[in-house]
Each structure stands twice: as structure tokens, then as C-alpha cells.
Amino acid sequence: MSGVSFELGGVSISSRLVLGTGGAANLHVLEQAIRAAGTGLVTVALRRVDSTPGGSGGLLDLIDRCGVRLLPNTAGCYTAGEAVKVAHLAREAFDTDWVKLEVIGDERTLLPDGVELLRAAEELVAEGFTVLPYTSDDPILARRLADVGCAAVMPAGSPIGSGLGVSNPHHIRLIRQCVDVPVILDAGIGTASDAALAMELGCDAVLLASAVTRAADPVAMATAMRYAVEAGRLAYRAGRIPRRFHALASTPDDGRPEL
């Protein structure tokens, strides 16, 4: 299907659905969900993986079997310094310069700290990382992150794990308009219609985890998300009709019989 893949950091990614691995009941279910989602990119927190020689490697083996690209993240970091250190550890452990940059500002909301995030992004870009920052839906911060060289911006639709969907569609549209890098909606997706809406707003991809891993049937939900992302992208490219206050008949009056 045209438009399914997209370019990220100079690499063609085979699907516009990015899948997180947190919250899965077990590795068997996670593997089934990854395959059902058709994703080409999965995120992994460094602290969830034993990457030392002789370590369990269960999650890494699973990712390798599925043939998808691994994107380490800096989950659990609250300062720029912590995030930079974790990014370096991930680069050494996984042999990748890619990092999903997370710098959390508050334990209750899990929303990003924009000041620390921008500081960490600038430092990591200067050190040769391909930086994909989890950010708020603030268009100005998104533009600043793009300006310092981030390969994409990843605004939250709503707080992580909340399932509230896209709380501020207008800001997501503004972000799409003010940056030239890919926009990946990250966090807050609850069901397939949320993912479709994100794509209809112009996002290049959607990243989600809890919506699949904590669903009653993770594999079925992964399948639903796959098609929702594809449908949303097609709808965005097709162009929706303008919203109108009054009705507009689809059938013309020409040829109507005189009764």
C-alpha cells in the first residue's frame, strides 16, 4: 500500500506504527503483537534488558526474530545529565546511535521537562546521536527541538498510559505545520480511532505501547492499530471535506421533477 513506509533519520521504516514493549504480559504475547502490528520499529527501555554478555537476552532475541529495528529509550530519566548517560549506555549496549529521548518532569503526569529535554537533545545531537525526543504538544518546543537537529519530534497526545487519545488536535496540527522533520504522536493512545485521528491530523507515524500491551486482547488490538494507522494516513492524503455549519446536499436539484 502506498505511503505505508516513511523515512526516519535517513532510514526507511517499513510501517508508520511504532510499538513500545512496556506492559506486555509475557514475551510470547509481545511477539505475537509485534507481528500482528506489522511494525518495523520497537522501543525498549535500557533498564528492561540484560544486555551484558551471557545475559538473558530474551527481549533482544525476540526483536531479532521479528526482524524489526530496536529503538532504545531513556525512560525513567528526570534530568538532562541522566538522559545523556543512559543514551551512551544504550549506544554501547545495542550498537546504535538512535535514541528515543525521554526526560520526565513530573512523576504524576509523566509529561516531559522541556528545559532539560532541549538541553539533552542539543548535547546528544552534537555527539552524533539520532535523537527522537518525546515532547509535549507545545509547537514552540517542537520547533526548537527540530532546530537543534532532532531527527523527529514526538509530541504526546495525552499523558502516558492514560488512554485519553489526542487531547489537543489543534496543537498537533500546528506542530505538523511548523517543523520539517517527521512528527510521531507518542503517548495517550487508547484505541484504534485515536491512532487514526493522529494520522488524519498529519502525523507521520504513531508510537503506542499500553493501548496494545494492556488491551484485553493485545494481538487483536495490534491488528486494529495497524489498519487504523494505514486508514488515517490514506484519509490525510485523500483530503477531508471542509466542515460546514449547514447541510450541503450531495444530490443536485437539476432534473428534479415538478410535482
Swiss-Prot record:
Annotated binding of 1-deoxy-D-xylulose 5-phosphate, by residue: 161, 187-188, 209-210
Matches recorded under Pfam families: ThiG
A GO biological-process term: thiamine diphosphate biosynthetic process
EC number from the UniProt entry: 2.8.1.10
GO function term, MF aspect, one: thiazole synthase activity
Active site: 100
Domain of life: Bacteria
Keywords for this protein: Cytoplasm, Schiff base, Thiamine biosynthesis, Transferase
PANTHER family xref list: THIAZOLE SYNTHASE (PTHR34266:SF2)
Descriptive protein name: Thiazole synthase
Species in which this protein is naturally found: Salinispora arenicola (strain CNS-205)
Lineage, top ranks: Bacteria, Bacillati, Actinomycetota, Actinomycetes, Micromonosporales
